[in-house]
């Protein structure tokens, strides 16, 4: 709320926080129903990407209301491509798993303790400009090249 005060042209609706079950279809329905009832909404900040996990879940024209969401999973990338979402805040999911296994192997096999108490994983802002590059990560992480050979 403090950050919002820096942008006087942006207003939060009086009932501007909308909750939903963490079920993609229900989340998309809440978002669509709310947008239809409040056409003045110019943007959405999604803490969870649930509404974007459904194919064709957003039923308004691209650009009508901007969308920024957490995660940049394969299902969500289509919303960047279509112009419905402007930014996805990507977490390094693959790195989390890779680094965790690496630390465990080093401890169990080499008896090496981690050198850092906390390991920060950088976030990546995925937009139309870097969508193709980010999408390649999923092909690599999900071994699509190996499967498609």
Residue ranges and their predicted role:
Residues 5-9, 32-39, 81, 105-109:
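Sec-exported extracytoplasmic/periplasmic mature domains
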Residues 1-2, 24-28, 72-76, 91-112:
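Hydrophobic alpha-helical segments within soluble ligand-binding/sensing domains
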Residues 95-149:
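Hinge/cleft segment of the Venus flytrap/periplasmic-binding protein
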Residues 82-94:
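Short beta-strand elements at the ligand-binding edges of bilobed clamshell
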Residues 16, 71, 92, 123, ...:
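Residues at the C-termini of beta-strands that transition into short coil/loop
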Residues 9-12, 64, 84-85, 122:
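A generic structural signal for alpha->beta connector loops
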Residues 16-79:
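Hydrophobic alpha-helical
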Residues 14-15, 67, 117-120:
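Beta-strand segments within the central parallel beta-sheet cores of soluble alpha/beta enzyme folds
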């Amino acid at each position: 709320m403090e950050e919002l005060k820096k942008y006087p042209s942006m207003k939060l609706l009086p009932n501007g926080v909308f909750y939903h079950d963490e079920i993609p279809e229900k989340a998309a329905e809440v978002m669509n129903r709310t947008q239809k009832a409040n056409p003045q909404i110019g943007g959405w900040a999604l803490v969870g990407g649930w509404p974007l996990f459904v194919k064709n879940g957003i039923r308004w024209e691209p650009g009508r209301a901007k969308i920024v969401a957490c995660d940049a999973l394969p299902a969500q990338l289509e919303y960047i491509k279509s112009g419905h979402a402007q930014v996805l805040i990507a977490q390094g999911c693959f790195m989390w798993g890779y680094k965790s296994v690496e630390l465990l192997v080093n401890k169990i096999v080499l008896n090496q303790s981690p050198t850092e108490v906390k390991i920060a994983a950088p976030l990546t802002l995925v937009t139309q400009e870097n969508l193709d590059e980010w999408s390649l990560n999923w092909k690599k992480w999900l071994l699509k090249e190996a499967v498609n050979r």
